[in-house]
Amino acid sequence: YNLAVERINKMGGVEVDGKKYKFEIIYYDDESNSGRAAQLAERLIKQDGVKYMLGPYSSGLTKAMAPVTEKYKIPMVEANGASRSLFTKGYKYLFAVLAPANVYLDVAIDLAVEKNGGKPVKIAQAFEQDAFSQDVRLGILDAAKRTGSNIIIDDKLPKELNDMASTLAKVKATKPDVLVVSGHTK
């Protein structure tokens, strides 16, 4: 963001209704805590007077901030929150630059079916239980249904994952054509 703001400001800023505006980035550490993110969004709007917001990292934090930006009619452009649920709530001031998470990996199933001569494939999947990962999972389920493929493993990963031996043992025993895993680095 800093590079973009620097360049835009060097070129004179942005013109709106015949008036030029320069950008300034103000940010705080939300500590990856959704309550804190909502609180800081309110602070940015009410105390710092921001008129435009760049979204936080993750669907969870975006989900916490969106009601605040909606309340104050502040546009928020989101580059890191992709949970489908963000875009089904009717928000008027939330804009995204990426596709929703449910379409992230569905094409992998289409490709696997294509590589398998157009025949359905066996799919193993393991997902964390957060909104983003569950939306990716729903996309895989939709792709499996659409292609006639079978989900042979559908594991839920714990938030504090230290060992995937159980899931990997199932994968080894069932020999799926595709393994899809979605989670987050800690």
Protein language model regions, located:
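Solvent-exposed, polar/charged alpha-helical surfaces in well-ordered, non-transmembrane soluble domains
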Residues: N2-E6, K10, G35-K46, K51-Y52, ...
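Acidic side chains
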Residues: N9, D29-D30, D48, E128-D130, ...
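Loop/turn elements at helix/coil->beta-strand transitions in domains of secreted/extracellular proteins
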Residues: Y21-E24, Q47-Y52, K71-M76, G90-Y93, ...
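An alpha-beta-alpha
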Residues: K92-K159, V178
